Amino acid sequence: MAVPKRKTTPSKRGMRRAHDALSSPVYIEDKDSGELRRPHHVDLKSGMYRGRQILEPKDD
């Protein structure tokens, strides 16, 4: 069974955990509609992606 030879210091533990934080999702303003949407994702209201119609727009 593997056992640590030395105690991990709080500094080393913190450096290891430095990349574990969760980041909030990024939103951009759509050029055509002005709505917020995720980058590199289809705009669900208009159904457009990169200037092309991908989905049928929602009629609410």
Swiss-Prot record:
<dbReference type="GO" id="GO:0015934">
    <property type="term" value="C:large ribosomal subunit"/>
</dbReference>
<comment type="similarity">
    <text>Belongs to the bacterial ribosomal protein bL32 family.</text>
</comment>
<feature type="compositionally biased region" description="Basic residues">
    <location>
        <begin position="1"/>
        <end position="16"/>
    </location>
</feature>
<dbReference type="Pfam" id="PF01783">
    <property type="entry name" value="Ribosomal_L32p"/>
</dbReference>
<keyword id="KW-0687">Ribonucleoprotein</keyword>
<feature type="region of interest" description="Disordered">
    <location>
        <begin position="1"/>
        <end position="34"/>
    </location>
</feature>
<protein>
    <recommendedName>
        <fullName>Large ribosomal subunit protein bL32</fullName>
    </recommendedName>
</protein>
<dbReference type="GO" id="GO:0006412">
    <property type="term" value="P:translation"/>
</dbReference>
<dbReference type="InterPro" id="IPR002677">
    <property type="entry name" value="Ribosomal_bL32"/>
</dbReference>
<dbReference type="InterPro" id="IPR011332">
    <property type="entry name" value="Ribosomal_zn-bd"/>
</dbReference>
<dbReference type="GO" id="GO:0003735">
    <property type="term" value="F:structural constituent of ribosome"/>
</dbReference>
<dbReference type="InterPro" id="IPR044957">
    <property type="entry name" value="Ribosomal_bL32_bact"/>
</dbReference>
<keyword id="KW-0689">Ribosomal protein</keyword>
